[in-house]
């Protein structure tokens, strides 16, 4: 059965993901370091991992597999999930695949190097609004349908 895993720390689309999981009657797992209330929805569970770097990422990567969907902005986690057979959607609606994760990781690493070399070079994050939420919902619907065929 398809499970929707959410890298929940600072995820801006938890409620949208819950709506999709509820509509499809599929389990959703919020994974975080704490600070979230236990969900009232019986389809949604909360996993609180110990404090520490990448603890939530490690938990998600260890539990996801073919037919599952992961929502994350963390590219190394996305790479691990894709290698485990899961599908990955970013909160902005971009679907990550084995074909596009390599260039995304390379760009991420390059930008980290640039920021380390020039502390005044900071990225300018765009806003997150209705258009991004709508794009996320469309992508998640499409990916969940494909995942259900696998799982």
UniProtKB/Swiss-Prot annotation:
Source organism superkingdom: Bacteria
Pfam families: DUF188
Family classification: Belongs to the UPF0178 family.
PANTHER family from the UniProt entry: UPF0178 PROTEIN YAII
NCBIfam families: PRK00124.1
The protein's name in its UniProt record: UPF0178 protein Pden_1915
Species annotation: Paracoccus denitrificans (strain Pd 1222)
